[in-house]
Regions:
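Helix-helix packing/entry segments at the starts of transmembrane helices
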Residues: 97-103, 170-191, 225-261
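Hydrophobic/small/kink-forming positions within alpha-helical transmembrane segments
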Residues: 20, 49, 75, 79, ...
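Hydrophobic transmembrane alpha-helices of multi-pass small-molecule transport proteins
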Residues: 48, 52, 72, 120-142, ...
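Hydrophobic residues within alpha-helical transmembrane segments
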Residues: 10, 14, 39-43, 73-76, ...
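Specific alpha-helical transmembrane segments that line the substrate/conduction pathway
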Residues: 35, 42-46, 86-117, 160, ...
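Membrane-interface interhelical linkers
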Residues: 1-17, 46-73, 119-125, 143-152, ...
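Glycine-/small-residue-enriched transmembrane alpha-helix faces in small-molecule transporters
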Residues: 1-44, 76, 84, 146-173, ...
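Hydrophobic/aromatic residues within transmembrane alpha-helices
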Residues: 29, 36, 40, 88, ...
């Protein structure tokens, strides 16, 4: 059992570290954000389907019509969630876009009392207020240090965060479907929805991306999305909910480190302080004596 837990942690950490490097590879793909998102979904869907076939697992749809409709809606949201996040990378630094995006758990925390009649504790209220203050720091410092482009990037990052939060809330009400099956269906719906959008907005120019661009697109689809999500969902069965929630913060930490130390993007003191407040208080909300009843999980959005 101990070996299985150790192996699960290694798979989870590997997936999270990979997710944190997405911005670096996206920067090397000379295509429109919506086209990158579309081909990411296509490649990842093929990889996940192959993974399920190798494991001898049959693809199963949700038993109820309501769950199927919710899954299809969340799949459409994932497509535009990816587009918003990739556009955010274009307008601002990877670190600022990521920190804005990781406001999603705070949105979920605020929405749960309204949707699920869950009462917020004093600790949750404090964490919500401090995380929001951190976001204000990121936004205000972005406007001061990077101009309107930075603020636009934060806006797209928050738009992606709202969609991410909606998908998390939808997934909270879904039962009876495997995590990998759920993600595969969401990706398939996402690419179907994105196809006409890409066709009419920018068209398809993947063959003009060059060898380097296509190689980075393949890495994004195969490694970051296909293999990454297979590793992630395969690890959950042997991890406690709180362990998985805590390990998920490797993703934004790696993303910020890549942004500053590898990509050479600047991060101001106020942005760093705001980022610490967002991630720190969101993580603090996950910690405690009890395992969270609804641990934050990956939903195909990273």
């Amino acid at each position: 059992m101990e070996n299985r837990t150790r192996s699960a942690k290694l798979m989870n950490i590997t997936a999270m570290a990979a997710f944190g490097t997405i911005g670096y590879f996206v920067a090397k793909i000379p295509l429109a954000s919506e086209e990158i998102a579309f081909f990411r979904a296509v490649i990842a869907a093929v990889v996940i389907l192959a993974w399920q076939l190798v494991r001898g697992r049959k693809f199963r749809l949700p038993a109820s019509r309501k769950s199927l409709i919710l899954l299809m809606a969340s799949g459409a949201m994932i497509g535009f969630n990816w587009i918003f996040l990739l556009v955010a990378y274009h307008y601002t630094s990877v670190s600022v876009a990521t920190l804005s995006y990781y406001f999603a758990p705070v949105i979920v925390m605020a929405a749960c009392p309204l949707l699920f009649r869950e009462r917020l504790s004093l600790k949750q209220i404090i964490c919500f207020a401090c995380s929001t203050a951190g976001l204000v720091l990121v936004i205000s410092s972005g406007g001061l240090e990077g101009g309107s482009s930075n603020v636009t990037g934060v806006g797209y990052g928050l738009g992606a965060a709202v969609l991410y939060a909606c998908i998390i809330l939808i997934n909270k009400s879904l039962t009876g479907i495997d995590g990998i099956d759920r993600t595969l269906l969401q990706f398939l719906v996402g690419l179907i929805v994105m196809f006409p959008y890409v066709l009419f907005k920018s068209g398809f120019h993947v063959m003009e991306a060059g060898t380097v661009g296509i190689m980075n697109l393949l890495v994004l689809g195969v490694v970051h999305t296909g293999i990454g999500y297979c590793l992630y969902f395969s690890s959950l069965g042997d991890l406690k909910g709180q362990e998985a929630a805590i390990l998920s913060y490797i993703d934004p930490l790696v993303a910020c480190a890549m942004s500053v130390f590898v990509m050479g993007e600047a991060m101001g003191l106020m942005q760093a302080a705001g980022g610490v407040m967002i991630l720190g208080f969101t993580l603090y909300n996950e910690l405690g004596g009890k395992t969270p009843s609804h641990p934050r999980q990956k939903t195909g959005c990273e």
